[in-house]
Regions:
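PLP-dependent amino-acid enzyme catalytic core
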Residues: 1-188
Length: 188
């Protein structure tokens, strides 16, 4: 294992600005909180094909890197997307649709309600737009297809044709633009 690390540039850098004793205040809790995590888990675990994914222990690599332990959460097979981050984009699609339904009808909905066809008319009028270099766009496109809304994904000129096709295979309109990822973000 040490041979593996010696063949590659590797350095462990500690964050010099970390404040381990800093309070987790209202500003942080507004973004990431226990209730939000419970809600996300409840919704995502209700999606068709949901299965927990493994947490893999990389003890040899941890030893070679001189760290106490190292773990890898293997998301690559989740929902058959072949993406290392399949949940966030699709969950964001749900949250946008959920918010639009709440805004237009005052009703609270779940993923199951949407799978059962509730508010199909509202969902059909939603267009989700995002920029990506690949994995995020695949998740967003899959989520849009799953929930029944339109999806436009912007990619930059350097994104491979394979990634473009993978995103388009979920029904998204993919728009390739000149420039960088930041240019794709501006278009989205």
């Amino acid at each position: 294992m040490n041979d593996l690390l010696s063949k590659h540039q590797f350095s462990l850098i500690s964050n010099p600005n970390v404040a381990l004793s800093a309070p987790y205040g209202a500003e942080q809790a507004a973004v990431l909180n226990t209730e939000g995590l419970r809600t996300a888990r409840r919704e995502i675990s209700s999606w068709p094909g949901y299965q927990p994914t493994p947490l893999v222990t990389l003890s040899g690599l941890a030893k070679a890197a001189n760290v106490g332990s190292l773990y890898y959460k293997d998301e690559g097979r989740r929902f058959g997307l072949g993406s290392f981050k399949p949940l966030g984009g699709a969950y964001a699609v749900f949250r946008v649709i959920e918010g639009e339904i709440r805004r237009t009808s005052g009703q609270q909905v779940t993923s199951i309600d949407l799978f059962d066809g509730a508010h199909r008319d509202v969902v059909a009028d939603v267009t989700i737009c995002a920029a990506t270099d690949g994995n995020h766009g695949r998740s967003v496109a899959w989520g849009a297809r799953m929930f029944g809304c339109r999806c436009i994904i912007y990619i930059n000129e350097a994104v491979s044709e394979g990634r473009e096709k993978a995103i388009a295979s979920y029904g998204a309109e993919v728009r390739r633009i000149p420039g960088s990822f930041d240019d794709a973000v501006r278009m989205a």
